């Protein structure tokens, strides 16, 4: 949310993901000429802020990572079918917890994951964040080594591959949740701190299997997932980046390239402290 204000050019805010609940997501720091939003939910909020501040525009483009998702949506289908065939299972569940010791489900959910795999004829694939405590990594790797229906994925492969392969996601408080929901697939969390919950959240590990069944079949749960797709980012058309380029060109065509933005001394100081000064000569 900060840029080197002294560099020439149109300043465009492109978001990292869908973290609408982060405290600074809606803070306007006056650095940007236009905001490229992911979907109607974000657009409506930023359009209201644009009316309030009066010095930036808003364009709904979608999130650029969705172009990659579109291009690779079925790239790993063969890998998925191979895993299911080798394990003799019918469905693939991804367990992707956060690494934060305060927020992670890792100390509590292991045995219930094993029960879920066994009772619902599922292969549970586990992919951990690189910053996960080594003791948890070692514990789960050793546990999975003795099971045919649990697969531990070591470092090196991106979690997005397994998101595309999975039928269901189990997590806690992770950035992967919204990305998976946008595939219109079920999500179950244990003890999430999210305030607006559009998926199944449980407070006890023993509730996992019931929540799994509910997420797959309940009409209200399915409708909530569709609401996220429709409002957070409906642009799985492969044209997000092109809309962004067109939007930037259109802004310059209408306004030219602004020489500078009106910033108070604090914003200028913050920018310089973050990025440094341009050294002349």
Which residues does each predicted region cover?
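C-terminal "capping" alpha-helix adjacent to the active site of nucleotide-linked donor transferases
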Residues: 203-220
């Amino acid at each position: 949310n900060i840029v080197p204000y002294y560099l020439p050019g149109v300043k465009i805010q492109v978001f990292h993901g869908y973290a609408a609940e982060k405290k600074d997501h809606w803070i306007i720091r006056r650095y940007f000429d236009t905001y490229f939003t992911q979907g109607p939910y974000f657009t409506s909020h930023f359009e209201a802020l644009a009316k309030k501040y009066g010095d930036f525009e808003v364009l709904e483009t979608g999130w650029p990572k969705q172009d990659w998702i579109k291009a690779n949506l079925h790239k790993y289908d063969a890998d998925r079918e191979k895993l299911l065939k080798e394990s003799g299972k019918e469905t693939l569940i991804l367990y992707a917890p956060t690494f934060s010791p305060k927020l992670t489900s890792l100390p509590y959910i292991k045995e219930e994951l094993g029960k879920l795999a066994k009772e619902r004829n599922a292969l549970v694939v586990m992919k951990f964040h690189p910053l996960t405590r080594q003791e948890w990594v070692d514990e789960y790797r050793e546990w999975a080594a003795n099971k045919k229906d649990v697969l531990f994925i070591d470092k090196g492969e991106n979690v997005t591959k397994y998101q595309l392969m999975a039928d269901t996601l189990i997590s806690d408080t992770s950035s992967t949740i919204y990305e998976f929901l946008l595939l219109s697939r079920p999500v179950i969390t244990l003890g999430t701190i999210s305030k607006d919950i559009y998926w199944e959240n449980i407070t006890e590990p023993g509730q996992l299997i019931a929540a799994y069944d509910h997420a797959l079949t309940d009409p209200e749960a399915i409708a909530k997932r569709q609401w996220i797709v429709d409002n957070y980012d409906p642009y799985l058309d492969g044209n997000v980046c092109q809309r962004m380029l067109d939007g930037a060109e259109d802004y310059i065509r209408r306004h030219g390239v602004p020489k500078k933005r009106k910033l108070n001394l604090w914003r200028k100081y913050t920018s310089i402290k973050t990025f440094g000064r341009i050294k002349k000569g």
